[in-house]
C-alpha cells in the first residue's frame, strides 16, 4: 500500500500541484515535486489526529480541488478537510478497507466512506464489497493499481539472465514455479505445498518451487504462515526437497527471479473478512513474460486474463490447479499477448484513469497516507 500511494502521488504530481499529509518519515520516500507534511509519531491515534489537524490547515490554505485519502483509514480526515475547504472528497479503497470487522471502524469509518464524492476501488471484487456497505454504485470507479514495466529484452538476454539467476540460487534445470508475496494464510502457500505441489511433482519429478517473501510484521487481519510450517507441510507431503526460500529480495533481483521461473503460482484462499483485493503480483509476472496460475478468488480475476496471462481455477480445486500448471509447462502461453496485457496496467495509464475519475485537469490534490 505504501508503494501504491507513492506512485499515486507521483502520477497526480505530473498533472498538477500535490500536497501529501503522511506519517513521520514519509518525506524521505516522497516523489519529486510533491509537498510533504508529516503528521504524528508513534501510536496510530497520534498519526490520525495529526493528519486531521495538518489536513485541515493545508486544505484551508491551499483550497485544493480534491482531497484524496490513500486508504480507508484516512477517509474521515480527508472528508473533513474537503468539507472545510470546499473541495471534493475521494478515497482509494482496498478490500480490507471495507471488511475490517472492528466495531468502532464500522461505526465511525463506514459512514465517511458512504459520504465520499468519489470512491476509487482496486478491483471488481472490492467494488462489490463497497456496494455491500452502502456506497452508491454511481460514485464508484474501478482502477486497479499500476505496475512498473521492465525494459524490453530479447530472447538471448532472457535466457542468459535466467541461467545466471539459477546459478546464483543453486537451482537446476527442471521447471521452476514461483511464489511472490507475504506468507499469510490468505496467500495459501502452505495449502499449495500440501495439496497441489505433490500432484505436479508426480508428472514433473524435477519441478522446484522458489518462494520470495517473509511472514508479515503486522497486517490487518493477516495470519502468518511461517517458513517452518510450510517446510513441515512439504516434508509430510514428500516434496520438502523442492522448496527454495529466498526471503525478501530487492527489486533488481526480483526481476531476475521472474525471468528464471516458468510459472507464477498464486493459490489465494477465500477467507471471510480477509479478501484478496487485487493481485498486483500477477501483473508484475505478466510484465516479465511469466504466466500465473491462480484460484479465481477476490480481485485476482481482474489481475489474470485467463488464457492470455495465465489460467484461473475454481477456488479450492487442487487437482484443477495442478492440471493447469502441468498444461502450461507442456504448452507455454505466447509471451507477446502477455506483455501487451500487462502494459495496460502501466503507472502512466493508472494516472490517466485516476485523474479522469477525480475530474482533474489542472488541480491541487491533498493526499492522506
Indicate residue ranges for each PLM-predicted region.
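N-terminal strand-loop element at the rim of the active site
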Residues: 3-49, 125-126
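Donor nucleotide-sugar binding/catalytic pocket of nucleotide-sugar-dependent glycosyltransferases
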Residues: 19, 114-163, 171-172
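Short His-centered aromatic/hydrophobic patch
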Residues: 69-75
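Conserved donor-binding/catalytic core segment of Leloir-type glycosyltransferases
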Residues: 160, 171-187, 193, 197-198, ...
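Nucleotide-activated donor-binding/catalytic signature segment of Leloir-type glycosyltransferases, i.e.
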Residues: 213, 222-252
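Acidic donor-binding loop of glycosyltransferase active sites
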Residues: 242, 248, 259-274, 290
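Short hydrophobic beta-strand element within catalytic cores of glycosyltransferases
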Residues: 282-287, 291-294, 304
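Conserved acidic donor-binding segment of nucleotide-sugar-dependent glycosyltransferases
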Residues: 306-307, 311-318, 326-332
Amino acid at each position: 500500500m505504501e508503494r501504491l500511494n507513492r506512485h499515486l502521488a507521483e502520477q497526480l504530481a505530473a498533472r498538477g500541484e500535490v500536497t501529501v499529509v503522511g506519517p513521520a518519515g514519509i518525506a524521505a520516500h516522497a516523489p519529486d515535486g510533491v509537498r510533504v507534511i508529516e503528521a504524528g509519531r508513534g501510536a496510530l491515534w497520534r498519526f490520525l489526529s495529526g493528519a486531521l489537524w495538518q489536513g485541515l490547515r493545508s486544505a484551508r490554505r491551499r483550497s485544493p480541488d480534491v482531497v484524496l485519502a490513500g486508504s480507508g483509514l484516512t477517509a474521515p480526515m480527508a472528508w473533513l478537510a474537503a468539507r472545510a475547504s470546499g473541495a471534493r472528497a475521494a478515497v482509494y479503497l482496498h478490500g480490507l478497507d471495507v471488511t475490517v470487522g472492528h466495531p468502532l471502524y464500522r461505526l465511525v469509518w463506514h459512514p465517511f466512506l458512504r459520504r465520499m464524492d468519489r470512491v476509487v476501488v482496486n478491483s471488481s471484487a472490492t467494488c462489490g464489497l463497497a456496494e455491500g456497505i452502502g456506497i452508491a454504485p454511481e460514485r464508484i470507479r474501478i482502477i486497479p493499481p499500476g505496475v512498473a514495466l521492465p525494459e524490453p529484452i530479447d530472447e538471448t538476454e532472457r535466457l542468459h539472465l535466467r541461467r545466471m539467476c539459477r546459478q546464483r540460487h543453486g537451482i537446476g534445470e527442471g521447471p521452476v514455479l514461483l511464489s511472490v508475496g507475504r506468507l499469510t494464510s490468505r496467500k495459501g502457500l502452505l495449502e499449495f505445498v500440501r495439496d497441489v505441489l505433490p500432484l505436479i511433482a508426480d508428472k514433473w519429478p524435477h519441478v522446484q518451487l522458489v518462494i520470495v517473501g517473509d511472514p508479515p510484521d503486522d497486517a490487518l487481519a493477516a495470519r502468518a504462515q511461517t517458513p517452518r510450517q510450510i517446510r513441515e507441510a512439504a516434508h509430510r507431503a514428500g516434496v520438502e526437497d523442492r522448496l527454495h526460500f529466498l526471503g525478501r529480495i530487492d527489486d533488481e533481483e526480483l526481476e531476475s527471479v521472474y525471468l528464471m521461473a516458468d510459472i507464477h503460482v498464486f493459490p489465494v484462499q477465500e477467507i471471510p473478512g480477509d479478501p484478496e483485493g487485487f493481485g498486483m503480483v500477477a501483473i508484475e509476472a505478466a510484465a516479465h513474460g511469466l504466466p500465473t496460475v491462480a484460484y479465481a478468488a477476490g480481485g485476482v480475476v481482474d489481475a489474470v486474463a485467463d488464457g492470455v496471462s495465465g489460467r484461473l481455477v475454481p477456488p479450492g480445486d487442487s487437482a484443477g490447479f495442478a492440471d493447469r500448471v502441468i498444461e502450461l509447462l507442456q504448452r507455454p502461453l505466447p509471451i507477446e499477448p502477455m506483455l501487451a496485457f500487462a502494459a495496460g496496467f502501466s503507472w502512466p495509464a493508472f494516472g490517466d484513469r485516476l485523474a479522469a475519475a477525480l475530474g482533474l485537469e489542472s488541480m491541487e490534490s491533498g493526499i492522506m497516507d
